[in-house]
Design a protein with these regions (language model features):
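S-adenosyl-L-methionine
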Residues: 1-18, 25
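Residue-level signal for inorganic ion chemistry
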Residues: 23, 72, 93, 136
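Conserved Class I S-adenosyl-L-methionine
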Residues: 48, 56, 87-109
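Helix-to-beta-strand junctions that scaffold the AdoMet/dcAdoMet cofactor pocket
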Residues: 68-70
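Conserved beta-strand signature within the Rossmann-like core of class I S-adenosyl-L-methionine
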Residues: 73-78
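Class I S-adenosyl-L-methionine
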Residues: 101-129
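Polybasic, low-complexity RNA-engagement segments
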Residues: 131-134, 141-168
């Protein structure tokens, strides 16, 4: 399979509409998973930083979403544990992008250090190798709900635009 690994600005993928079957995002976060090994991470943490990170994560997802093919899978991952950056953003992706969260109750059942959250899984530091992680999977169930124009930011499709069949 073809693989692209990048840390480019996600807007760089705008020309690749529907190109990818799977997109794995490890988005910048407030870094709560780093608290055990980095005292500075603890000192820099704040509710304002969590809000800033959650907003940044949504922009990243909104920018890459059009490049995910209908039926494609988005893996959303952070190294933090707060609900705003994890299940809160997964819920936002589901509601705003029309994505279907993919959860299997028995997928990771019984694995030490893995906790099922509302919409994903948390790997608990100290119980798994590494500093911990939160991960969710979502399926893109339809064509892009966002309309992009050269003159402005993305906007949500209207019901009329969504219902309209593409011209042949």
């Amino acid at each position: 399979p073809n693989v692209v690994v990048t840390s480019d600005d996600p807007k760089a993928f705008a020309a690749l509409s529907g190109y990818f079957d799977i997109i794995v995002t490890d988005v910048p976060c407030s870094g709560e998973g780093m608290f055990r090994k980095d005292l500075q991470a603890q000192e820099q943490w704040s509710e304002d930083n969590v809000a800033l990170c959650a907003s940044r994560q949504r922009r990243i997802i909104a920018d890459v979403w059009p490049s995910l093919a209908p039926g494609g899978i988005l893996i959303y991952s952070t190294c933090t544990f707060n609900v705003y950056e994890n299940d809160g953003n997964v819920r936002w992706i589901s509601e705003e992008m029309g994505a279907e969260p993919l959860m299997k109750d028995d997928l990771l059942a019984g694995m030490p250090g893995v906790i099922k959250t509302g919409l994903g899984y948390s790997l608990v530091p100290g119980l798994v190798e590494g500093e911990g992680q939160d991960c969710s999977a979502l399926r893109k169930v339809s064509a892009d709900p966002y309309v992009r124009s050269a003159s402005g930011p993305a906007r949500r499709r209207s019901r009329q635009e969504t219902a309209r069949k593409p011209e042949s």
